[in-house]
Design a protein with these regions (language model features):
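Extreme N-terminal starter segment of soluble prokaryotic enzymes
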Residues: 2-7
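Generic enzyme active-site microenvironment
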Residues: 8-9, 13, 49
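A broad "ordered helical/assembly scaffold" signature
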Residues: 8-10, 27, 58
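Short glycine/serine/threonine-biased micro-segments
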Residues: 17-18, 96
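Short glycine-enriched, charge-decorated loop/helix-capping segments at active-site entrances
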Residues: 18-27
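Active-site alpha/beta core segments
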Residues: 32-112
Length: 112
């Protein structure tokens, strides 16, 4: 059985880049590295994931009229247990610029 080589690109989206509401330190520096991996053409498939939320997502602080990173109590419907939820800044809202794959990343039509 032959092996398939896959490159998985996880959540390289505008809202996670420098200046975004959920900026990840060093994420911008990954763009040229990923572009080089894509350019090498040594992968049988490229998978790119995107984090997408509705504008009123339960994890957004704005949904609860709270400050980002404040905490609220929520009920887990499956277990019936109360849990603490840390509220996040509004990010990666479906079909917005922030949820799009970062501009500098090479895009291929055949991403999975």
């Amino acid at each position: 059985m032959s092996k398939i080589k896959i490159l998985t690109i996880v959540d390289m989206q505008n809202d996670y880049m420098k200046g975004g509401p959920m900026a990840v330190k060093g994420a911008d520096e990954l763009v040229p590295i990923i572009n080089e991996l894509i350019k090498n053409g040594e992968y049988d498939a490229i998978i790119a994931t995107q984090d997408w939320h509705p504008s009123n997502h339960i994890s957004f602080a704005s949904t609860h009229d709270k400050e980002p990173f404040s905490k609220i109590k929520v009920m887990d419907k499956e277990t019936g247990k109360e849990e603490i939820l840390t509220l996040l800044p509004r990010h990666c809202v479906a079909r917005t610029y922030g949820s799009a794959i970062v501009d500098g990343l090479k895009k291929k039509k055949d991403y999975i």
